[in-house]
Amino acid sequence: MNTTINVNLAGQHYYFDQAAKVKLEIYFEEIKSYFTDESFLQELMTDVEARIAELLNDIRLDSNQVITIQHIENVIQIMCEPNSFKIYEEKTQS
């Protein structure tokens, strides 16, 4: 059984199993690796966290439901892979 971890995401409280938390942290780090502009990155990460929180609220049946790695994989599929963020940055900067 995975350990359950309390996670605060975009000002909202969630219970994550350990594998889900690690998967989400890796996703965030991959996004961050594509950007050098700190102010843009900070704004982007705030928006990404808020959107992920919205998606998780749609997924969970109640506030005590544990978020699993499958939930995070579904969210990432909706959000898109991190390399898509780099393509967006290149288009907006040219």
Predicted regions span which residues?
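Soluble N-terminal domains of membrane-associated systems
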Residues: 1-94
